[in-house]
């Protein structure tokens, strides 16, 4: 995509430093050597003729439900758990249609037509934390509630033909993925204790996500890690960090994790789970922090206290305090 040799050199250098070993896409990549007329085996991204937004949304509507079903099925909900679902929450910033994924979930699980549905859209990578906050409010106000949350993103649906280095570098980290979770009042897994948002309005232009004629247009400034580290250093987390055993930090990129670790003066292994998810899956926007929490849940000891953290446009950091039951 980049034609300037200097920019290509910078891109190759950044690839070598990304600490991403694998990413997934719902599109099949071209493999092997030689000249191609398309960036993918599906010939969706044909050279010089990238699809418009309408075509991308058509493909989202065709493809997203399958990924949603796989994520929900991994929960292996029994009949009692299914019948106890009263609310469905969906986060997604990479595609939209109506009736949407919330309806698809109800149909797939055969849920009651009276299930309450909420879509949290276009908030970016921190949307899962916001959805967990909403789920906690629901369960606290309705103790018998069961909230099924799905976080689904097809980031590779918005690949762009561009010579803008910052935009091309953003493609380097993003990938596709989905996560599903069940939030109830039962004492198991992680208990959600409290939430807080940290915003730095003077940096609102450093991450943007806008709908254009040829897909959704991402800007991820190289200034984000430094500004994020500075903002976190000035929060109460600095004083509380010794009380936190588990750090579930959204792996927005290696430089983001490095900035968080430095800004909060965390031990070298504090972000091991986040770095593993980044290496194995890349940045899947809102779904990513749920992958980190899943890994922590498998190893956490009862009573351990944690802090989950995701970042996005604003510049915003959404945080969640939790403990293992």
Could you describe each region identified by the protein language model?
Residues 1-59, 146, 155, 159-230, ...:
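Condensing-enzyme catalytic core mediating Claisen C-C bond formation in acyl metabolism
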Residues 48-83, 87-89, 93-96:
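Hydrophobic alpha-helical hairpins/lids featuring a short glycine-rich hinge
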Residues 51, 83-87, 107-121, 162-166, ...:
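Glycine/charged-rich beta-loop-alpha catalytic/anionic-binding loops adjacent to active sites
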Residues 71-85, 232-246, 264, 296-300:
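Phosphate/pyrophosphate-binding loops at sites that engage ATP/ADP/AMP, CoA/4′-phosphopantetheine
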Residues 83-86, 113-116, 141-147, 168-169, ...:
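Short coil/turn connectors at secondary-structure junctions
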Residues 93-94, 112-114, 119-140, 229, ...:
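Claisen-condensing/thiolase-fold acyl-transfer catalytic domains that form or cleave C-C bonds
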Residues 96-111, 149-160, 204-207, 257-271:
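Acidic-glycine-rich active-site phosphate/pyrophosphate-binding loop
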């Amino acid at each position: 995509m980049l034609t300037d040799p200097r920019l290509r050199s910078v891109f190759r250098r950044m690839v070598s430093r990304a600490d991403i070993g694998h990413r997934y896409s719902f599109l099949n990549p071209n493999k092997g050597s030689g000249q191609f007329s398309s960036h993918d085996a599906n010939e969706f991204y044909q050279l010089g003729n990238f699809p418009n937004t309408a075509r991308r949304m058509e493909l989202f509507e065709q493809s997203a439900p399958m990924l949603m079903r796989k994520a929900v099925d991994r929960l292996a909900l029994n009949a009692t758990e299914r019948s106890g679902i009263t609310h469905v929450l969906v986060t997604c910033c990479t595609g939209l249609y109506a009736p949407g994924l919330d309806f698809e979930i109800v149909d797939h699980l055969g849920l009651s037509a009276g299930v309450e549905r909420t879509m949290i859209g276009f908030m970016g990578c921190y949307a899962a934390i916001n959805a967990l906050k909403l789920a906690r409010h629901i369960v606290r106000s309705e103790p018998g509630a069961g909230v099924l949350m799905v976080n689904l993103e097809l980031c590779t649906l918005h690949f762009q033909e561009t010579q803008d280095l910052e935009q091309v570098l953003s493609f380097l980290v993003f990938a596709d993925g989905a996560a599903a979770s069940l939030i109830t009042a039962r004492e198991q897994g992680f208990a959600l204790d409290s939430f807080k948002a940290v915003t730095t309005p003077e940096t609102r232009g450093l991450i943007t996500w806008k709908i254009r004629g040829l897909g959704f247009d991402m800007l991820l400034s190289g200034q984000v890690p430094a500004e994020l580290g500075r903002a976190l250093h000035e929060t109460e987390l600095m004083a509380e960090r010794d009380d936190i055993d588990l750090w579930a930090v959204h792996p927005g990129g290696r430089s983001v994790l490095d900035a968080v670790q430095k800004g909060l003066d965390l031990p070298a292994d504090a972000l091991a789970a986040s770095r593993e998810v980044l290496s194995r899956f890349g940045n899947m926007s809102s779904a990513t922090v749920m992958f980190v929490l899943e890994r922590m849940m498998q190893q956490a000891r009862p009573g351990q206290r944690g802090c989950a953290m995701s970042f996005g446009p604003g510049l915003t950091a959404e945080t969640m305090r939790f403990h293992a039951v």
